[in-house]
């Protein structure tokens, strides 16, 4: 930098002092301040340069121009480093790869660090040497205080560097320790080249690479034979001449050699001498067989003989004098026969694979008896080296799948039948071992011999294997099994967990008795047929009993619960009784799932295949809308209904048992359920029963069977049930049949309720189709019937829509005098007679469709008006009977069955105007504000058609006391009285006014707004 361009100093020494600096005043028109501002401190550079120089470098001084170039070079280095991490060709490393991988230090520049990994408590040391932080970089004079501050800053920087280096080394060691403890691949170092090295060396930390394998060689046939080329013929001729000179048997070339050639050669081990390019093999000096070359080449037989000859002077018992040697020709023939006798084992590898050709130092000084009588055992116990071939490709060509057997002590090969029998016996032994779980062969799980060092000391008992005629004794068989052991011993016998033992690499101190059975080279377990084990069932199962049904006790239905699916107890797999748990029929199964809702369970017994295993008491469910329409809880459909609570095994319609005197024990009803009716109580016990408060009615579940005592002469008998009870009981039976009839699965709800007590078993398929279509054969007859039938159909329709206000029931006929009943007399039950057609139409609509809320309201209303209903019934019984049927009471009392009304009376009823009467006395409305007019008229018509004997005055008091038990009977009597009173007032008003009913209706002052609303609602019901 030239002196002329150097700007004036920013600070100058104050006059008269040596160290005091004051601001220098300069010409701001000629000089200007550098525009560079530090990114970290946001402080502007205070260098002063001429404006011409600042304009050349973009308003910056020369120092910050060089600094910007340095930043640019650092950026380029960072880019190069990022590219180098993704490339395998990396340069020399400046730092250790472990330290470089933790993102604290870079291999290229230690100035660049990852900002997110820098320790937070240390200062940012990346910008310590920036020029704008050194305020004394251009000072010519320094005070002592400035020098001390500079030294202190340098010492503090060294301290910070040492602390940071300590933390870096600590974190590097921690990270290395964690990485070495984890085997997950994502925790490897991030450096690419180092990662490949680390990944390649990980296998050496385990024993995975210690596998005894060889490369699959390419097998070729030996070229010695009649098809040799000219060069081989010349070589063969020369060797034949030399063999004749040496008195050796020449090589026969008339037959083709079938032995495989050695690797990278065209000759087998016996003919490798013909290869002029090989240098490894030579001819034995003693016998002329192939031997490994050397100073004195000898075959394996002569190596052993020379070793024995050298130890003749040894006083050891193992060393004996060698026998007399035969001539070289006989010696060669004997050795050739010995070698050829064992060539069938491994024709693929030839004599080179015979480990016996290499003398073993352990067997070098063995005694003469073992040497001469039996060949020496192999050093490597097991099959030859494995071949790296996929198992689905099978063995290489030329390898037969005969199980490997060593040459020592060769026995005649076993036939296929003997092998099959041996394999069969082995399978039977395995089956017996697998089934004897409590035998002596089982080792308890908690045993010291199964863990740690105790497992190594454990010695398994010798397993007796079947021996055939091939082995003379058991010791010889164990010797064979010892020589047939594979190379890699199973971990269940000789190795610790997680490791493998290789017999060829360490001394085996275990005896032959502890070794497992010999395994074939290519196991045939894949051909075994997996037969299931037959375990006798009579050991684990008791006799299966039929599910007769729930016991007579606890017959009340379950309380109604909300939110329970309606198929709760249906389609369950009935649990078979066993010795562990005897499940009660009322106990629900705990293993019910949606996958088990498949079909009704069948009986597992073969003798009960014709009937369903599920008893008649536990029926299958019906659709939810039909159950709700029938007044049932969909969740309790599968359970036994309350109206069928009879003795176990008793069918509906059967006569009770002979034990009439003892009442049946019935559990108290649950809250929300109904008290079951005692079916086997005597009439006297029923008559003397104290009145109980009314229970909540559950639709068609309650059946009240009343018996009428008829006096005939001196004897008294109990008649059958009344027609109202018969109609209701038969209706329940019909509805229960429809619920489980598969032919009526898609029937309409309205048609389902209007069926009544019809016998569906006699209907044909066409009639059922008409019922399902809504065109019943009785529909046309009902339309042209009596007005009572028309009113009953309206009542049924209104009740189905929720507009009917009452659930009517036919009142029970009262009994005769108590004095006429003899308690000791026999009680006979007559067969139920069919009910009239009107009751058929009224009963389904009146008893099955009412809601629970209206039932409670009507029950309360009937209780409040029970006393008034008794008086009204006594005063108006004769007049109502005379008005409806047109016959005097005296004549009516003599008849047992009600006569059919005459056609004149029916016509008169049809012509009668249907306008409501303007009487001031009306029936007391229910709490819901509606009058049960339609239901009352329907009940009145039903009573008039089946009117029993008029009760006498003596029985009116007892009837009034017993009527309190059934609030529906009181409500029906009240409705009959109200209807009869309306008819009497209508007749009186007609005779007074003379047919001017319209004016009377208009001028009637008793018509209120409530009456108008009732009239409008009734007209709306008729329209619907």
From Swiss-Prot:
It is found in: Nucleus; Cytoplasm; Cell projection, Axon. Pfam families: zf-C3Hc3H (PF13891). InterPro entries: Potential_DNA-bd (IPR025927). Residues 903-914 have a biased composition (Basic and acidic residues). Residues 447-486, 501-564, 577-617, 645-664, 710-739, 773-1024 are annotated as: Disordered. The keyword Transferase does not apply. Its main location: nucleus. Residues 467-486, 501-514, 528-542, 605-617, 810-832, 873-883, 987-998 have a biased composition (Polar residues). Coiled coil: none annotated. It comes from the Eukaryota. The keyword Nucleus applies. Keywords: Cell projection, Cytoplasm, Developmental protein, Nucleus. Residues 584-600, 710-730, 784-809, 859-870, 916-943, 952-962, 970-986 have a biased composition (Low complexity). One of its GO terms (cellular component) is axon. Transmembrane segments: none annotated. Nuclear factor that influences the activity of genes involved in vulval development. This is Protein sumv-1. It comes from Caenorhabditis elegans.
